Amino acid sequence: MAVKKILLLNGPNLNLLGTREPHIYGYDTLASIESSLTTYLSSLTPSVTLLSFQTNWEGALIDRIHEARTDGTDAIVINPGAFTHYSIALRDALTGVDIPFVEVHISNVHKREEFRHKSFLSDKAEAVICGLGVYGYRAAVEWCVGYLKEKPKA
């Protein structure tokens, strides 16, 4: 059986997790979240692996999404950070590669400033998870594993 790949993407300022506004985002660092997800995923199934990428640059995020089209990525979990609210280019990249994706936000963006209520990605995502803290990443990965098991062979 071929190993499936889930690509975890994190956008701007998420490299500051653990120290940036911990009253909103918590005290877990991005490295600890990635490590925890890798451990959790291996407990769920040996046939799915997690790849991680974080950048503060919109173009780099788009380039990585394009790369996913040819590197065997089967599903994407993305916390686009502030790109959520204005990046049509990110939306176009995600829809252009035809890889299912889950949008994740640590905080409940709907309880925050008005400008955070609009997402350019939500209507194209398979699922949107927000307000569950870092557990949202785990829920997204678990959803992807279920999706990949149920996905018909091409």
From Swiss-Prot:
Alphabetical keyword list: Lyase, Quinate metabolism
InterPro entries in UniProt: DHquinase_II, DHquinase_II_CS, DHquinase_II_sf
Residues at the active site: 25, 105
Enzyme Commission number, as recorded: 4.2.1.10
Pathway field: Aromatic compound metabolism; 3,4-dihydroxybenzoate biosynthesis; 3,4-dihydroxybenzoate from 3-dehydroquinate: step 1/2
Gene Ontology biological process terms, A to Z: 3,4-dihydroxybenzoate biosynthetic process; quinate catabolic process
UniProt site (Transition state stabilizer): 20
Pfam family, one: DHquinase_II
Protein residues bound to substrate: 79, 85, 92, 106-107, 116
Superkingdom as given in the UniProt entry: Eukaryota
Quaternary structure and interacting proteins, as annotated: Homododecamer. Adopts a ring-like structure, composed of an arrangement of two hexameric rings stacked on top of one another.
NCBIfam families referenced in this protein's UniProt entry, alphabetically: aroQ, PRK05395.1-1, PRK05395.1-2, PRK05395.1-3, PRK05395.1-4
Family: Belongs to the type-II 3-dehydroquinase family.
Function as written in the Swiss-Prot or TrEMBL entry: Is involved in the catabolism of quinate. Allows the utilization of quinate as carbon source via the beta-ketoadipate pathway.
UniProt name for this protein: Catabolic 3-dehydroquinase
Lineage: Eukaryota, Fungi, Dikarya, Ascomycota, Pezizomycotina
Name of the gene this protein is made from: qutE
